[in-house]
């Protein structure tokens, strides 16, 4: 199986050990070819927290760039093509927009998604507890089909033990771990 799918599936397995709220639907018809070109589109921000989608998108690009079997398109090129074809929402792509991105960026796959929750909750005993929730889709540009999808939810206090040990206190740190 390709590195991209293994990484995304591994992310879901990792979070399964940390979360009772993890939901993941996994489907794949065939593994990605070695050297597949992937573009990460800007995640849609449904959380209401300013800057959340930019951070999650950046973390996703960094996580995928660690792989040796795929090539991740530079975000500046992705943004330029989205402007060129007037694509305003990366989560509501038409087939024509997907075809335009695929030919303009010379990619075979698109990663897109939404930031559902990105906030901190006050806890009188532990202070601020971060919470992050995202959904991610991997789309095959040739068939216009979603070949993988997943949802990940995490709270900073999920791995907490006695006296607050093990709790994640930073929203950015939790977001980074959710994407990994």
Label every model-predicted segment.
Residues 18-36, 101-105, 126-129, 139-180:
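C-terminal/domain-edge helix-coil "capping" segments
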